[in-house]
Amino acid sequence: MDIGKKHVIPKSQYRRKRREFFHNEDREENLNQHQDKQNIDNTTLKKAEKQIHKDSIDKHERFKNSLSSHLEQRNRDVNENKAEESKSNQDSKSAYNRDHYLTDDVSKKQNSLDSVDQDTEKSKYYEQNSEATLSTKSTDKVESSDMRKLSPDKNKVGHEEQHVLSKPSEHDKETRIDFESSRTDSDSSMQTEKIKKDSSDGNESSNLKSEVISDKSNTVPKLSESDDEVNNQKPLTLPEEQKLKRQQSQNEQTKTYTYGDSEQNDKSNHENDLSHHTPSKSDDKDNVMREDHIVDNNPDNDINTPSLSKIDDDRKLDEKIHVEDKHKQNADSSETVGYQSQSSVSHRSTEKRNMAINDHHKLNGQKLNTKTSANNNQKKATSKLNKGRATNNNYSDILKKFWMMYWPKLVILMGIIILIVILNAIFNNVNKNDRMNDNNDADAQKYTTTMKNANNTVKSVVTVENETSKDSSLPKDKASQDEVGSGVVYKKSGDTLYIVTNAHVVGDKENQKITFSNNKSVVGKVLGKDKWSDLAVVKATSSDSSVKEIAIGDSNNLVLGEPILVVGNPLGVDFKGTVTEGIISGLNRNVLIDFDKDNKYDMLMKAFQIDASVNPGNSGGAVVNREGKLIGVVAAKISMPNVENMSFAIPVNEVQKIVKDLETKGKIDYPDVGVKMKNIASLNSFERQAVKLPGKVKNGVVVDQVDNNGLADQSSLKKGDVITELDGKLLEDDLRFRQIIFSHKDDLKSITAKIYRDGKEKEINIKLK
């Protein structure tokens, strides 16, 4: 809301202040009308004061002028108030000291009033005898009776006025006034209210004023002059009105303390009261600064909104007191009051004022302590909050400065980190893919090699069937096992094929039917066979180029757990070319073989163990390594309940030695020592005693028969000798004896034997040729 002079306040705030201003003026007008009516009834005044502020247009104009002047003065002193903030604290301390001084001054005044009371008692006797005093007292009684009739209404009005004045406005509830800066003003207002209460007691208030007035003719003209000055003064602004109110309160307080001293003191106080209606510029400035300091120090108050209701209440109170003083002085000029009654009323009113001042000082002291502690706590909380905000601001400023100084480097660093993370993820993904590809390639290569070796081996493995006569007396299942087997083409010379198979596969037949992987068949001839090694060689002719000879490996370098493939023809031609996979389960196994199926073991075969699946028809099949090279020939398997995948193959190095002799000689020449033997484990106790065998001997053989002129006879070996070791090897039974002797078929050198003869141990050399 624009109120002129470049002052703008909110419209709602303007309306609220205007409403309060008009309410206060209406209340003041009603009060003045009531007072004028009372004065007319009491014939103390000849005419009532004229009504003021009756025109609503003048009200609006005066309110705007007063508010704009106050805001202009306040805005002009805002900067000065900041500089005077420290000074205001000192003023509060001085105000506190001034309160103590006023308390001492009141006590002094009380002493002076006591002395005046004593003088009054002395003059009491003289006044009783004075006729003039009697006439005055009679007149006083008549007029005081009239005043008592009006006193109830006056007291009632006084209470109503006090209630209206003490009622706080909405703006007063929101505004907090600094107690230190307005301490003196509040003291003066409290004392003035006490005087008002005393003045509402009818004749007592009028007698109080008449006590300090000695010359009626001099007093009445002065009061009329003061009335004219008040009526002729120009409208005051809000700061000026507040300044005037405070000065009047201070002067009234000073006058109250000086009642009863002398007539001259009363006149001087009255003149000072009238002279103080014109404020000085310096005092006006101090009051304005104090008022602005009160408004500025209140955090809940709007900086552009003064406490109008409070100012109007104070101004109204001052004007009311001033009007009452005029009424009382006019009443005193028209009445004659006895000195005795005046002094007694003055003494009672003085006591009331002193009690009110003491109570007010105590209350102000308590409020001062409470206000001071509250201000200190508020300052501490505000300082802590400001420190916290300053710390947060400092941190944010440091971060901003750091970012502004180094943001290019930080951006580059973040970019490098992100690039490293991305490259690392890419490389890890590539490496992972490479490893997966390598694994896949390795698996594919392994699978491809295995399949390649299997396909090549299949081309070298054939089906071998002997030509068993139709009138064979063998059982059908027995004949089928002997008649069908597998063979391996270990050598190819032109169209001639050399096939190795098992001796028990070819049996006693010379001709064998050979069927290739492409289902073509030829007839092969048995070149030789050896039952002790269970190997045979078949020769066949074929121009089929699909038949390949197998690559030969080395059985001396076998490794336990090495992967192997077994290729054969289980159950005959229908399942030819079957490939099974396994590993080498054992090395250097001694396997008992029963060739003639008489339930007696005939040979102790040296072989290696495999776990690949071997079925009837796989005999004579090929065992190849991962490179597809032949490392053994399938010879036997254990067929027992609850036994699976325990098969045996003859090492390829032993096979090569046997097939070479079978190709050229058709047979194998083994050394023949010319003896018959029994196992020690099969001897009974009588037989052990007969050969005088020591009890510690558990294994070995006993020579049961020696051929004449045989190698054993030539070696001095006799019947009854017990052989426990041969060629440095522990001898378990006769099969082990035959195996050791046959192992020297190629060199035929003499071997050492440890024997027991007639219970005595000795060694002899056995000749093999």
UniProtKB/Swiss-Prot annotation:
Q: Where is it located?
A: Cell membrane
Q: Does the keyword RNA-binding apply?
A: no
Q: Which CDD domains match?
A: cpPDZ_BsHtra-like
Q: What InterPro entries is this protein classified in? A: Chloro_Bact_Ser_Proteases, PDZ, PDZ_sf, Peptidase_S1_PA, Peptidase_S1_PA_chymotrypsin, Peptidase_S1C
Ordered alphabetically, the record's keywords are:
Cell membrane, Hydrolase, Membrane, Protease, Serine protease, Transmembrane, Transmembrane helix
From start to end residue, where is composition biased (Polar residues)? 126-137, 202-221, 247-262, 298-308, 331-347, 366-390
GO terms for MF: serine-type endopeptidase activity
Instruction: Extract the SMART domains matched here.
Output: PDZ (SM00228)
Record field: compositional bias (Basic residues)? 1-20
Would the keyword Cell membrane turn up in this protein's UniProt record?
A: yes
Could you tell me where the Basic and acidic residues compositional bias lies? 21-64, 71-108, 138-186, 264-295, 310-330, 348-362
Q: What is its main location?
A: membrane
Q: Name one GO cellular component term.
A: plasma membrane
Superkingdom of origin: Bacteria
Active-site residues per Swiss-Prot or TrEMBL entry: 504, 534, 619
PANTHER family from the UniProt entry:
PEPTIDASE S12, PROTEASE DO-LIKE 8, CHLOROPLASTIC
The similarity annotation says: Belongs to the peptidase S1C family.
Name recorded for this polypeptide: Serine protease HtrA-like
